[in-house]
Amino acid sequence: ALLHQLCKIPVVSDFRSADVQAGGQGAPLAPLFHAALAQGMPKPLLVVNIGGVANMTFLGADGGILACDTGPGNGPLDDLAQKFLGLPYDKDGALAASGTVDEARLEALLGHPYFARPAPKSLDRLSFSGLIAQATEGLAPADAAATLAAFCVAGIARAPLPAPPLRVLVCGGGRKNPVLMAGLAAAFDVPVEPVEAVGWDGDALEAQCFGYLAVRSLRGLPLSLPTTTGVARAMTGGVLTG
């Protein structure tokens, strides 16, 4: 309502409530936008978004879409950089690159039952906070960062995909972290590239996504599917003001 008052234009908001009320998890909401952008590209294609939480959109050769949150993304690394470096994030993955992964603690993190659940599934940014605090306690900051970066990558690599992708495209702030990108390249035996490689604007992608969802909302088209949020049926959503 405030945005409508300030801008004097119709505003679509509250994209998630209808999905949640119909039994869905309300996230992730980008998969249909990813599918629209990827029309004409060879499939299967995996689009990975690494924000505070990491999530993936799998676009099948048969036109199917599967999505889920894969695990923590940049969030724990950002928290670590703020705590030990006084910086909002680990620029260029420098802290993680200078450390060594603690394999035993990494395996403890990956023992969380979330990773055994099928897709679709979703997380909150703080879902792993307690476990991460335990797993990084007593580690040197660089080793903690290296371990958390490996945790992010392993969560993505263990995503329940129906088939191996031909290509992995990465969006979100994590695409600018060389440690995460190198980890993904090692985990997938296919090209792993930032979305700019196919002409997408990685910095604007999320804003573009919700503009696209707003138009779908105005047209009464679905914003989520049973295979993206777990909702019982394809679900539209959004609330128009103005």
Across the structure, where does each feature detected by a protein language model lie?
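A glycine-rich, Thr/Ser-enriched phosphate-binding loop motif common to dinucleotide/cofactor-binding enzymes
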Residues: 22-32, 144-155, 206
